[in-house]
Amino acid sequence: MDIRKIKKLIELVEESGITELEVQEEEGTVRISRAAPVIAPAAVQYAAAPVVAPTPAAAPAQVPAAATTAPAASDELSGHLVRSPMVGTFYRSPSPEAKAFVEVGQSVKVGDALCIVEAMKMMNRIEADKAGVVKAILINDGNAVEFDEPLIVIE
């Protein structure tokens, strides 16, 4: 392959933003790949992470209040704990305008929707794995939840 063709292919890769190009001709094969653009966006994402960190720093004022309530509640409450199957954001209703899936004192059957945990823009419906009466909802709407964190108590 002619060196001028190869130079034009390199220019094409640089201008178009594609990361890899492979051309086969009778004379041979040329593969041009760029790894630098993949690294640059990752660095930008990591640079954005500290910006997110100060936002939760404002939230600790709320977290201690919730943390104080949750241990006291779990000490007093007995029953079946419905736990979060993933890290995400807890929602009591399918949308902000909609009615909550369940309220304290409400009877639930196995398979009834209790809440939603949003993870990576996916709404994951959490269902009752035991029939009974909702005794307590341990998380406030819109709060972050950790994996295996108790969400709801069913008795």
From Swiss-Prot:
GO cellular component: acetyl-CoA carboxylase complex
InterPro entries recorded: AcCoA_biotinCC (IPR001249), Biotin_BS (IPR001882), Biotin_Carboxyl_Carrier/Decarb (IPR050709), Biotin_lipoyl (IPR000089), Single_hybrid_motif (IPR011053)
Gene Ontology MF term list: acetyl-CoA carboxylase activity
Source domain of life: Bacteria
Pathway: Lipid metabolism; fatty acid biosynthesis
Residue ranges of every copy of the Biotinyl-binding domain listed in the record: 72-155
Gene3D superfamilies: 2.40.50.100
Protein name as annotated: Biotin carboxyl carrier protein of acetyl-CoA carboxylase
Quaternary organization: Homodimer.
Function noted in UniProt: This protein is a component of the acetyl coenzyme A carboxylase complex; first, biotin carboxylase catalyzes the carboxylation of the carrier protein and then the transcarboxylase transfers the carboxyl group to form malonyl-CoA.
Swiss-Prot/TrEMBL keywords: Biotin, Fatty acid biosynthesis, Fatty acid metabolism, Lipid biosynthesis, Lipid metabolism
Source organism: Haemophilus influenzae (strain ATCC 51907 / DSM 11121 / KW20 / Rd)
Membrane-spanning intervals of the chain: none
GO BP annotations listed: fatty acid biosynthetic process
Modified residues (N6-biotinyllysine): K121
PROSITE patterns: BIOTIN, BIOTINYL_LIPOYL
Record-linked CDD domains: biotinyl_domain
